[in-house]
Structures are given as C-alpha cells and as structure tokens.
Amino acid sequence: MRLDRRELAGALADIGVLVPIAVALIVGNGLSATAVLLPAGLLYLTAAAVYRLPVPVQPLKAFGAIAIAKGLGSDEIAAGALLMGVIFIVLGRLGLLDLAARGFPRALIRGVQLTVGLLFLKIAWGLVTDPPKSFSEHALSADWALPLALVTLVLAFALRDYPITLALVAVGAIVTVVLAGGEAAFGPSALALPSLDTATIVTAFTVLVVPQVPLSFANSCLATADAAKVYFGDQGSRVRPGRLATTFGSANLFAGAVSGMPVCHGAGGLTAHYAFGARTGGAPLAMGGLLLALAIGLGTSLAELLTAFPLPILAGVLATAGVLHILLLRDLRGARAWAFALFVGVVGFELNLTVALGIGLALWWGAEGLRRLPRLRPAA
C-alpha cells in the first residue's frame, strides 16, 4: 500500500458518478449530507483493508436515479438500502455469486462492461447538456460547458499517466469556493434513524430494489471481479464476486440504519481509479478518509458547496473513464465473442441489462449445447 501522487490522483478519478447522485439525494430527497457520505467513506476504507487494491465505491445507480426521479423520502431509501444489504450479504456468504460467475462467459461480462462504459458517456453528456436541477444555480450553458468538458476529456485522457486529476479537482475546488461564496459552516449534519412500516418496505422493494439487483449482480460483482483480474492479474483474485457482495452489502446495512446513501462497487469505477494511477489500497484509503472528513467536518454546508462544483470537470473525467472502460473489449477474440459482447452491451444500454443478459446467456449456452450434441452417424 502506498500514498503517492499517483495514488491520490487515482483516488479522485471516480467522482463523476459520486458527486451528482450524492448532491441530488441531499438537495432533492432531503438526505443528510453526513449520512450520504459516511457509508461511501467507510466502504472505501473497508475496500482498502480487505482488497488492498483500488476497489471503487459508487452510489447504486439505478436505485439512485429512480429515487431522485420519483422524489422518494429518506425512509424508502433507507428501507431499500437495508434490503440490498440483506440480499447481497446472503448471496455473498452462501457462495452463490461465486458459483454463478462460473456460468458467465467472458464475452457477456465484456458486454456488461460495454453497457457501463456507454452509461458513463451518457451521464457525462447529460451533465453538460441538461444539468441536474440541483446544479442549476451555477451550471454553465451547453455552449460553454460542452467545449470545456471536451477540453477536460482530452487533458485527462492524454495526461492520465500524470496526476492530472489532482490538478483538475484543485481547479474545481477553487471555482467551488468562489461560486459558493460566504463562510462554510463546520460540523456534521444530523443523522436520523429511519421510520419503517410494511408499506415503506414494499415500496422500497418493488420500486428501488428489484430494478437494482440485476445491475449490482452483473456490474458490482461479476464485472468488477473480472476487471480486477484484467488490471492486476493474480492480485486481483482477492476481488471475488461473493466477497464484493459481502462488503457492499454490509455498507448498505449501515447506510439504511442512518438513512444514508446506498452504495456498491463498480467495474467502471475500478477502471477510473486504475487509469489515473491507482495501483494499491492507498487510493481507497485516501478517498475514504476524504469522504469521512467532508461528512464530519463540512456536513452542514456540503450541499451548497457541492452544487457549485464545475460540471465540465466531472463530465470530462467521467467520459474518460467511460472510454477506457469500453476498451476492455480489446481482449475479445473471434466474431462470436464480439457479437455477444456487442449484443449485451447495446441492448443493456438501450433497453435493459437484465433482458440482455438473460437472452445472451440463453443463446450462448444453447449454442454450446448444440455444439456438444453427438453427431448422428449413418448406420453401418
């Protein structure tokens, strides 16, 4: 484990997903800023200790998007986090995810990673062309934001072997302070236990958990474990699907208990950390420490500060990670593998990842079964 400029630069590389969802949950859904960042910070520290590699922490993307779009309150979000925690701890501890992973061909996992890469690009585009409402006060028009995001993307891509994200985040922090103005209030925001009843739990399960479980299974567990092996070889064997499920499941039990932001791991985040220099557990250690410091030290004023962070910087870094994540497909060999990966990736992006994986698995193993059938031989 090390903590040098490269590790610190890599640690900051995945903020393009974290910041917009966190801000929307704080501003739009009324979650405590401290409760939003605490689970993410603690899971980063856990990842540093357990995996000793730059395993990422992200908000639950489908879960968060639905909660934001529907304006759900902290109780429904907390109930969903608790349910996600229970489901994935059980799946992880029973070894079911490690067993299921053996049935997923590499081509289909690459398809999942293609879906995630495309989603990163879509989110980045939306940040500058249709900014989230919570950022509207300080957002630039698309005429300015889009060129600035493209410049950020080019710089981030070309200089990713240097600590470019440190420079970009430093610029963003200066702009944030200037735009937010005034003096920051120090101290954590209040934490609250959720108030749960049957109706709240049923709503959380049907509206939030059911759409999220397949994505977390495919991306947070299978695709993240695969990406770790690609980037870190034998060291990546510590990053198993079942272990990933257990660590982020445990974090969600805590998130639910404090009415905070549900979190997971993610293959795209691993690419982001790795691409910008992270190679050890030092990156998640640094990021976890930063998030805890912000949650405890600036929780009362964090929402106002984060809404002023420049969206072109978030979009440019996120788009770079998306492009690099799509490049994982380079190791595919043969037309069949490419066809399956592209099918899962495009259908998962345009329609539904669960549907894409279901059809992909059925076609893959159906074809395998036909290939293994004994050929009929003419009678002698």
Predicted ranges, named:
Residues 71-184, 286-380:
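Membrane-embedded alpha-helical modules
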Residues 6, 13, 141-149, 162-164, ...:
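Hydrophobic, membrane-embedded alpha-helices of multi-pass small-molecule transporters
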Residues 31-36, 52-64, 101-108, 262-269, ...:
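Short, non-helical or kinked segments that cap or interrupt transmembrane helices
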Residues 16-22, 56-63, 221-223, 260-269, ...:
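Transmembrane helix boundary and interhelical junction motifs in multipass membrane proteins
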Residues 1-8, 183-195, 229, 233-237, ...:
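Intrinsically disordered, low-complexity non-transmembrane regions of multi-pass membrane transporters
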Residues 9-71:
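Transmembrane helix-boundary motif of multi-pass solute transporters/channels
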